[in-house]
Amino acid sequence: MRFQPVIGLEVHVQLKTDSKIFCGCSTRFGAEPNLNTCPVCLALPGALPVLNQKVVEFAIMAGLATNCSISPTNIFARKNYFYPDLPKGYQISQFDLPICLAGHLDIAVGDQTKRIGITRIHMEEDAGKLVHGQGGGSGVDLNRAGTPLLEVVSEPDMRTADEAVAYLKKLYQIVTYLGICDGNMEEGSFRCDANVSVMPVGSGTFGTRAEIKNVNSFKFVKAAIEYEIARQCELIEDGGKVVQETRLFDPNKGVTRSMRGKEEAHDYRYFPDPDLVPVVISDDWIKRVKNELPELPEVKFNRFLTEYSLPEYDADVLTSSRPLADYFEQCAQTCNNAKAAANWVMGELTRSLNDNGIAIEDSPVSPAQLAGLIKLIDGGTISGTIAKKVFEDLWKNGGEAAAIVEQQGLAQVSDTGAIETAIDQIMAANMGQVEEYRGGKDKVFGFFVGQVMKAMKGKANPAVVNDLLKQKLAG
């Protein structure tokens, strides 16, 4: 029997606010345990929540960027369950009236575009964290309790692990472009639960789903979904039944393992939180937030195609992150050579950043410095080979490309007399190759170019070298 996978994602986006969703405590990651807490975080008697307005604005931004409708009135609800890192005995979330509804994202699937529906986006608080000790005991760190989250719930529209990863990357790109999430997946700022089921091909009835909790990398999401699909298919083929449950992915072994039975909504006994009034969002508020939205990735991609005449591949790479796009654009506007700027940013710069584990925001070579280097190439002052050496110097020592070229005497030689002398000497020393070229062996030409450049220590103008060589070798 052939099976069709059905996949839906619930993505938790940690918002980049200075303070928590219902109190003024810091959201800074990595503080000493229980340092960033207060009576609200600790659920002490009489402590009341006060909603952080910035969280609502970030939620509106996310909704607009994912083509959702914004609910004019939405309420917070208590999601009741017991866990040691949940001090109140409930989580403040949203249920019946979330802030964003009925959106979508379009993803690339091969040469086609597929639309993935977004059921809802709602605001909620994060729980604390259990810290397991070596002696068998566990501590509770409530620094994270009350950190603001958006939960983005997709429709079950994905049919492969690759589609799920494409959707996840698109959403990640959007929330980081918006500046509402730092995107640090290792710290849990962007993580997802994957709901996976399988059904016979041609069937219109979804199978029983399993939820894979808290997967925090694109690689692991793909691996977890692929394993779970294979597990369910094998189970059904062997005569078993898929149980609705929550599972965890073990990245070391590449398998999912049962964690607990999957709860339904009624198990959480949702009801409106009496300590929080409904949030009313006016049209004027939505318009103001919309006017403040940054240029989104898809719009920027299309603009790079038209404004800078870039190939689709270049535009796609350069708009993959907002800092990368900003760096390229500053460089291109300064040097007036967009294609060269794209090549250097995607080539030498990205390679150096990756080799040294540095984010582009912290690049030792600024857009202006790189633009200065490109101008020297375009002006014929240095060759591409010399430019790479100058870039290395800029990376290590800073400064300006023009000053480095002058100080180190790296300007390329365009003097025909000096180049002709080098060509004559090389031809005289390699008459066999000269005869081969004149006999029709064109590939030998590259040998002569290399020898001349070597003799001129890489400083000869390649265009002048080519022209003079052709004349000399023609006899």
UniProtKB/Swiss-Prot annotation:
Pfam families listed in its UniProt record: GatB_N, GatB_Yqey
HAMAP family, alphabetized: GatB
Organism annotation: Trichlorobacter lovleyi (strain ATCC BAA-1151 / DSM 17278 / SZ) (Geobacter lovleyi)
Subunit structure: Heterotrimer of A, B and C subunits.
Function: Allows the formation of correctly charged Asn-tRNA(Asn) or Gln-tRNA(Gln) through the transamidation of misacylated Asp-tRNA(Asn) or Glu-tRNA(Gln) in organisms which lack either or both of asparaginyl-tRNA or glutaminyl-tRNA synthetases. The reaction takes place in the presence of glutamine and ATP through an activated phospho-Asp-tRNA(Asn) or phospho-Glu-tRNA(Gln).
Taxonomy, superkingdom: Bacteria
GO BP terms: glutaminyl-tRNAGln biosynthesis via transamidation; translation
Keywords: ATP-binding, Ligase, Nucleotide-binding, Protein biosynthesis
A Gene Ontology molecular function term of the record: asparaginyl-tRNA synthase (glutamine-hydrolyzing) activity
InterPro entries xref list: Asn/Gln-tRNA_amidoTrfase_suB/E, Asn/Gln-tRNA_Trfase_suB/E_cat, Asn/Gln_amidotransferase, Asn/Gln_tRNA_amidoTrase-B-like, GatB, GatB_C_1, GatB_Yqey_C_2, Gln-tRNA_amidoTrfase_suB_CS
PROSITE patterns linked: GATB
Principal EC category: ligase
Catalytic activity: L-glutamyl-tRNA(Gln) + L-glutamine + ATP + H2O = L-glutaminyl-tRNA(Gln) + L-glutamate + ADP + phosphate + H(+); L-aspartyl-tRNA(Asn) + L-glutamine + ATP + H2O = L-asparaginyl-tRNA(Asn) + L-glutamate + ADP + phosphate + 2 H(+)
Name of this protein: Aspartyl/glutamyl-tRNA(Asn/Gln) amidotransferase subunit B
Similarity remark: Belongs to the GatB/GatE family. GatB subfamily.
EC number: 6.3.5.-
